[in-house]
């Protein structure tokens, strides 16, 4: 799968990032997202595959493109038989976030990117549009920290695993009222807190790379992005755990569903019989082969944002895989027409 799709999924996120970055700083988050969705879908439909969106822009009646259940790729088209051999075809599940951090793009802030994860059919957890309690940590802490422990306990464990004092640790937390007590506990334990307004996928992945000065992600964010983060962390050998949040009182706002009982019923309909289960990255991204790709829209911890020059643009992307156990940073110059010069730095 990697040998045939690796380069193409990089191009998918590159095109989404370029499209969205043209709306950077214009205050139009919905437009920045919409053009990224269009660009991502158009490029995916040119790939020799039969793909199915398991995490996308929403339910079919809520999203015109890249909705959950939508099929993408050349081999899903009406005349697919002339292009595709069914005996050689691998069906693929896809999780996408064409513009992760729409507010970041709209207001010209750092940390937004276009992301996707793919695996064979059934290899990615089809998370409902709920919230998820998350814990991400470096590979050295995998299996040692635990989402059921307090932040204080996990910081002590993390300190031992990384051979650092707690005062040297940096924990990323979403800047939300629901995290007031968590933030205070982290600070009381002696660690430092980096608050972010959006974009916790980037924060989770950054835990797996030394030199980012991010050592953990804690708190509650969107469940679909949790699956994408888990796919990346599985490729990188990092620690990731997620637990679905189905009680609206926990997050106070924005949760799909009006009641705890209604949300529990919805989970039951989806076949989730243990709503309190803690999922590891091997369960959220359980496929034999998992690929993850991201491209910076605005500058971030791991990647530069899209940089335009006369006649073209330059992007930085990341592609990682469970198969090759590699993390490739890809620097690409895109020539839209005959440029007067090519941007090198």
Curated annotation (Swiss-Prot):
EC number annotated for this UniProt entry: 3.1.3.11, 3.1.3.37
Binding positions (Mn(2+) 2): 97, 100, 225
InterPro entries: FBPase_class-2/SBPase
Subunit structure: Homotetramer.
Keyword tags: Calvin cycle, Carbohydrate metabolism, Hydrolase, Manganese, Metal-binding
Short name of one Pfam family: FBPase_glpX
Assigned protein family: Belongs to the FBPase class 2 family.
Native source species: Microcystis aeruginosa (strain NIES-843 / IAM M-2473)
Protein name: D-fructose 1,6-bisphosphatase class 2/sedoheptulose 1,7-bisphosphatase
Function comment: Catalyzes the hydrolysis of fructose 1,6-bisphosphate (Fru 1,6-P2) and sedoheptulose 1,7-bisphosphate (Sed 1,7-P2) to fructose 6-phosphate and sedoheptulose 7-phosphate, respectively.
Binding site for substrate: 100-102, 131, 176-178, 198-200
Gene Ontology CC annotations of this record: cytosol
The keyword Electron transport belongs to this UniProt entry's keyword annotation: no
The keyword Ribosomal protein is assigned to this record: no
Functional pathway: Carbohydrate biosynthesis; Calvin cycle
GO molecular function: fructose 1,6-bisphosphate 1-phosphatase activity; metal ion binding; sedoheptulose-bisphosphatase activity
Catalytic activity: beta-D-fructose 1,6-bisphosphate + H2O = beta-D-fructose 6-phosphate + phosphate; D-sedoheptulose 1,7-bisphosphate + H2O = D-sedoheptulose 7-phosphate + phosphate
Cofactor: Mn(2+)
Positions bound to Mn(2+) 1: 33, 57
Any one Gene Ontology BP term: fructose 1,6-bisphosphate metabolic process
